[in-house]
Amino acid sequence: MAAACGPGAAGYCLLLGLHLFLLTAGPALGWNDPDRMLLRDVKALTLHYDRYTTSRRLDPIPQLKCVGGTAGCDSYTPKVIQCQNKGWDGYDVQWECKTDLDIAYKFGKTVVSCEGYESSEDQYVLRGSCGLEYNLDYTELGLQKLKESGKQHGFASFSDYYYKWSSADSCNMSGLITIVVLLGIAFVVYKLFLSDGQYSPPPYSEYPPFSHRYQRFTNSAGPPPPGFKSEFTGPQNTGHGATSGFGSAFTGQQGYENSGPGFWTGLGTGGILGYLFGSNRAATPFSDSWYYPSYPPSYPGTWNRAYSPLHGGSGSYSVCSNSDTKTRTASGYGGTRRR
């Protein structure tokens, strides 16, 4: 080597040494790693709500993550979003992200987040490490539907709307209020249907007062079951010849007893309560949605794999869906952030 690199071959020896250095140092520095990509060369990203990014230096993150907006993150969850590289603005890559959204929602602020290969300032990123963070806002139509929903569903919509915008502490208080309301409803139902209330006799009757007692205590069918009002057991045959003689008195007494809160009052009350506490419980009745935990399981030897979240995690949903839901292609625009 020394003999070959004479005074006239100094340039050749320098190139040969540089070549040997690149052959040995390149793989060590990851220059030939197929997972190391120049971000500007990435043309498109297809991201899924139930998958995680790859990782090398940091922990993996969800490929799709809602971070806020006027509609909140629980009202609607897009399943797949595709982002296209729209060019370089002199600072970083700019993206256009599209998906099918309910006509009540639109994208707010969006940003593509990728893991730098060596650091957060590296122009090269790890393949598969990019995810999208987005805000979900209401459209004008969505705001109109929200207002109409509040007018139509009354107390249920108001309570759910309050729950949606309140903090976690206030949610606990609203849950306590709900329990108190349900207990009150149970008490009303008990008083209407199950409690055998005592009613005073009518102010005037042309028959002797003992006729009512005779009808009630000489009935061959016996007294009503414990816990139920006697007037709900219906007319009962006495099994005696006095039936014809005291029939009008029995009818008058029964008519008086049924004049209080009875079957039709309970039926109307049940219908109103069923309407208020039925299926229309959400403040944003547009669609169902679920999302998964924001942190994947950690397993050794899986640094460069895309994770899928475990099922059974915390979720949020809206039970009030619209069968006439319409969708359209929505777009969001934003830049890049390296982590």
Curated annotation (Swiss-Prot):
Name its cellular compartments.
Endoplasmic reticulum membrane
Lumenal domain ranges by topology: 31-173
Q: Which InterPro entries match?
A: SARAF
Membrane topology label = Single-pass type I membrane protein
Domain of life of the organism in this record? Eukaryota
The primary location reported for this protein is endoplasmic reticulum
* Tissue expr: Highly expressed in macrophages.
Which cysteines in this chain are paired by disulphide bridges?
A: none
Give UniProt keywords alphabetically.
Answer: Calcium, Calcium transport, Endoplasmic reticulum, Ion transport, Membrane, Signal, Transmembrane, Transmembrane helix, Transport
Q: Which residues cross the membrane?
A: 174-194
- Which cellular component terms (GO) are annotated to the entry? endoplasmic reticulum; endoplasmic reticulum membrane; endoplasmic reticulum-plasma membrane contact site
User: In this record, what's one Pfam family?
Assistant: SARAF
Cytoplasmic compartment spans: 195-339
The keyword Calcium belongs to this UniProt entry's keyword annotation: yes
| Listed Polar residues bias regions | 318-330
Q: Which GO terms describe its biological process?
A: calcium ion transport; regulation of store-operated calcium entry
Q: Where is this region: Disordered?
A: 318-339
Signal peptide per UniProt:
1-30
Oligomeric and partner information: Interacts with STIM1; the interaction is inhibited by the interaction of STIM1 with EFHB.
Q: Which family does it belong to?
A: Belongs to the SARAF family.
Question: What does it do?
Answer: Negative regulator of store-operated Ca(2+) entry (SOCE) involved in protecting cells from Ca(2+) overfilling. In response to cytosolic Ca(2+) elevation after endoplasmic reticulum Ca(2+) refilling, promotes a slow inactivation of STIM (STIM1 or STIM2)-dependent SOCE activity: possibly act by facilitating the deoligomerization of STIM to efficiently turn off ORAI when the endoplasmic reticulum lumen is filled with the appropriate Ca(2+) levels, and thus preventing the overload of the cell with excessive Ca(2+) ions.
Q: What is known of its domains?
A: The cytoplasmic C-terminal region mediates interaction with STIM1, while the N-terminal lumenal region mediates regulation of SOCE activity.
| Name used for this protein in its record | Store-operated calcium entry-associated regulatory factor
Organism whose genome encodes this protein: Homo sapiens (Human)
